[in-house]
């Protein structure tokens, strides 16, 4: 049954069950009512199951399909390692007590009823009444042999039960192995889940096993199917010169790439000149779509992965290295096919004309961010002499970048400049150092030029009114903005809200006002938390954080599938145009592409964050007993989170604050002593001692050093 037929049948069945004369029936009875033959009943049951999963219909305790009770909600259960959990329903987290979980496991899709409405300062509470679908079918954990059988202790502490492994499902696992387990039975009140070992990742102490375990736990694919590797062998190492007449030739332009020293996938290049006061900026992006054809094995795998994943000891690429480091890498001194966005920009930063075309380029020089910084910021004579033929271009790049940045700032673009970190590992994968990583002049220049190209391409294709993929950042929820406004008022700041909406310029002005103040870090973090997460959509809804009306991701087709997808659309439109049939095709596939791309981006971000937390905890486990300066980055009822200058964050549990009984003030994000009235608040500088760190739990424990507050 195709998607169209499936959706049509869902609509018919949904209307039947919501008819006022309908009475609850079992699936077999509905089949008889609709004269569905026995051989087609499985299709009917799939439709019924889909409607239940979507929460559109319900199932009684006797297995009869019924109208969904308005008091029954459907959502995803998020467990905790303390037994209780939350069900996320349309963005709201509903608290579930341990006794009300109905044996639901982490990520299960469930139905629940509300048992306690929202009270001041407290969430709504609920009770799970039915598990609709289990969310985790595979678990990564440590294998423990126990006689003839075994158990796997899940790495994910939110999966609260050990998994029983029968004797014939152990494979060759031994105690201490990290394994991937397929769950065959999810258990109940009296039985643990049961599963089988499907992969052995290595011993828990083997180098790299810890990070591979995270990769597996997020189900991130890291090995390419055989058909992909066969396809990649057919891709040439050099461009097809017979296609040169069909492309715009930009090989005569002075063109450079600027990347990290170790980068091998150079997918963007820049050309720039100035004539009669007009800047001619060229952003040239590797033409990956020339080699990754729609519906090929390569394309299907790229879509499946969605994005490259950057972990501290490895990169899991979206596309094989032979492609990303070879024909699609804009290497110095070789001809390469590209998609070029050529922009004419006036002295105010306004893009007055542009041209998007398939092109051929030849990069004159491969530069690093460090070298360009030495030229523009450090005025390093040796570096300037080494690249003397390109120095005028770098100066011009800096000049234009400042103009573009100023124009973005004038319209309200918000720049959250939080410190990032670089974790340095030894050959055995142990963390040696954690260094703050800051953007320099060169990285900002490239960001400015990429933003300009992304906006230009987005606006061009918006007005063409053809299906496209946009990068969207929605306006923050009014409740979160009102909470932020109330909080910053404690510090004497205010933001203007009109018709329950806020303009990004208001938040930009707030960032400018707090710059350099003690509360800067605190208010910046709370402002960021008030923002929604950006994602991919087929509608052009704008980008709130950039204050941009039109925005897309055009500049990284090697590592992001949405970029590759729009390259394909652009190339098609540049040729004979997009036919009605192809427009219909894109209208059908792009909603799923954008949804999947947003999900895989979130998965990659979560995995990267998890690995960082794990390595930071491992780093701190070697520094227990040492004292550090830090800043309070979070305040909760259970304690204080303190962030160190190297971005490591740890918890001072409220039980460690033994000099008084501390009460949490949710409105001001403070813990205050009942007797002493001593307060701990966000942004406050403290001295802490590391008292514990768990690589397994990804946690760091601190204790306030009283004498040094």
Predicted regions and their residues:
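Charge-lined substrate channels and their catalytic hotspots, especially those that engage the 3′ end
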Residues: 1-282, 289-334, 373-374, 670-671, ...
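Electropositive polyanion-binding surfaces
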Residues: 32, 180, 186-187, 213-220, ...
């Amino acid at each position: 049954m195709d998607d169209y037929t499936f959706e049509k049948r869902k609509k018919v069945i949904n209307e039947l069950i919501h008819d006022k004369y309908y009475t609850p029936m079992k699936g077999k009875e509905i089949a008889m009512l609709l004269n569905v033959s026995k051989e087609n009943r499985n299709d009917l049951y799939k439709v019924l199951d889909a409607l239940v999963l979507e929460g559109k219909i319900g199932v009684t305790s006797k297995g009869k399909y019924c109208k969904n009770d308005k008091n029954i909600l459907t959502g995803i259960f998020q467990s905790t390692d303390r037994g209780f959990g939350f069900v996320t329903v349309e963005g709201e987290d509903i608290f579930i007590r341990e006794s009300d979980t109905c044996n639901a496991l982490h990520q299960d899709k469930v139905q629940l009823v509300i048992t306690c409405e929202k009270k001041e300062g407290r969430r709504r509470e609920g009770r799970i009444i039915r598990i609709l679908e289990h969310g985790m079918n595979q678990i990564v954990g440590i294998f423990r042999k126990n006689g003839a059988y075994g158990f796997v202790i899940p790495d994910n502490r939110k999966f609260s039960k050990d998994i029983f492994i029968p004797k014939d499902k152990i494979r060759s696992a031994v105690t201490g192995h990290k394994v991937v387990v397929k769950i065959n039975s999810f258990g109940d009140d009296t039985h643990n889940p049961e599963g089988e070992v499907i992969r052995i990742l290595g011993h828990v102490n083997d180098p790299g096993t810890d990070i591979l375990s995270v990769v597996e736990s997020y189900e991130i694919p890291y090995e390419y199917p055989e058909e992909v590797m066969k396809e990649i062998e057919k891709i040439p190492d050099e461009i097809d010169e017979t296609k040169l007449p069909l492309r715009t030739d930009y090989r005569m332009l002075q063109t450079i790439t600027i990347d990290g020293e170790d980068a091998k996938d150079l997918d963007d290049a820049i050309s720039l000149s100035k004539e009669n006061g007009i800047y001619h900026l060229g952003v040239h992006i590797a033409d990956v779509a020339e080699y990754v054809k729609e519906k090929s094995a390569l394309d299907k795998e790229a879509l499946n992965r969605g994005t490259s994943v950057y972990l501290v000891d490895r990169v899991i690429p979206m596309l094989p290295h032979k492609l990303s480091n070879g024909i699609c890498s804009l290497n110095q001194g070789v001809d390469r096919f590209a998609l070029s966005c050529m922009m004419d920009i006036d002295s105010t930063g306004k893009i007055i004309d542009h041209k998007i075309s398939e092109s051929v380029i030849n990069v004159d020089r491969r530069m690093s961010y460090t070298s360009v910084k030495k030229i523009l910021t450090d005025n390093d004579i040796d570096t300037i002499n080494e690249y003397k033929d390109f120095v005028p271009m770098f100066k011009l790049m800096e000049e234009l970048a400042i103009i573009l940045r100023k124009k973005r700032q004038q319209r309200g673009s918000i720049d959250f400049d939080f410190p990032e970190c670089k974790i340095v590992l030894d050959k055995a994968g142990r963390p040696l150092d954690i260094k703050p990583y800051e953007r320099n002049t060169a990285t900002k220049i490239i960001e400015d030029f990429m933003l300009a190209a992304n906006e230009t391409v987005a606006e061009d294709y918006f007005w063409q009114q053809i299906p496209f993929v946009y990068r969207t950042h929605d306006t923050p929820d009014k409740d979160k903005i009102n909470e932020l406004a109330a909080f910053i008022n404690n510090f004497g700041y205010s933001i203007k809200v009109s018709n329950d909406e806020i303009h990004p310029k208001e938040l930009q002005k707030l960032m400018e006002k707090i710059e350099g103040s003690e509360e800067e870090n605190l208010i910046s973090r709370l402002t960021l938390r008030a923002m929604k997460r950006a994602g991919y959509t087929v509608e052009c809804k704008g980008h709130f954080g950039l204050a941009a009306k039109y925005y897309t991701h055009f500049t990284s087709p090697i590592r992001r599938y949405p970029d590759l997808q729009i390259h394909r659309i652009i190339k098609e439109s540049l040729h004979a145009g997009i036919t009605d049939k192809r427009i219909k095709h894109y209208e059908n596939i792009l909603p799923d592409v954008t949804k999947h791309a947003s999900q895989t981006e979130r998965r990659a971000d979560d995995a990267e964050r998890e690995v960082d937390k794990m390595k930071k905890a491992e780093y701190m486990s070697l520094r227990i007993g040492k004292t550090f300066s830090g800043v309070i980055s979070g305040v909760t009822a259970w304690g204080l989170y303190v962030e160190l200058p190297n971005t490591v964050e740890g918890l001072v549990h409220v039980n460690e604050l033994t000099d008084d009984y501390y009460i949490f003030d949710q409105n001001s994000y403070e813990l205050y002593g009942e007797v002493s009235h001593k307060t701990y608040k966000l942004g406050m500088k403290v001295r802490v001692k590391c008292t514990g760190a768990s690589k397994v739990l990804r946690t760091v424990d601190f204790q306030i050093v009283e004498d040094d507050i």
